Amino acid sequence: MKLTCVLVVLLLVLPFGDLITTSNTEDNKRGATPWQNSLKARGVCSTPEGSCVHNGCICQNAPCCHPSGCNWVNVCPGFLWDKN
């Protein structure tokens, strides 16, 4: 039970981790954190031609999953381990 709670908390918090260290100002737009870059480097995430890939990709550049760019939680649909 404790492990399940920890995993749920991690899944809820991880997409927002860069909010703690990155300010949302016009001069400093949201970018990918190092762990997000490493996910992209390993090929887990991809957004070819700006299309949404159902694999839990963290949005770095618009468009991604939503016509205006990242969706409200800054994450594409799916899970990080879903490689479809």
Swiss-Prot record:
Disulfide bonds join C45-C57, C52-C65, C59-C70, C64-C76. Residues 20-42 form a propeptide. It is found in: Secreted. Coiled coil: none annotated. GO terms for molecular function: ion channel inhibitor activity; toxin activity. Residues 1-19 form the signal peptide. It holds the Pfam family Conotoxin. Keywords: Bromination, Disulfide bond, Hydroxylation, Ion channel impairing toxin, Neurotoxin, Secreted, Signal, Toxin. InterPro entries: Conotoxin. The cysteine framework is XII (C-C-C-C-CC-C-C). Mu-conotoxins block voltage-gated sodium channels. This toxin reversibly blocks voltage-gated sodium channel in cephalopods, with no alteration in the voltage dependence of sodium conductance or on the kinetics of inactivation. Belongs to the conotoxin O1 superfamily. This is Mu-conotoxin-like Cal 12.2b.
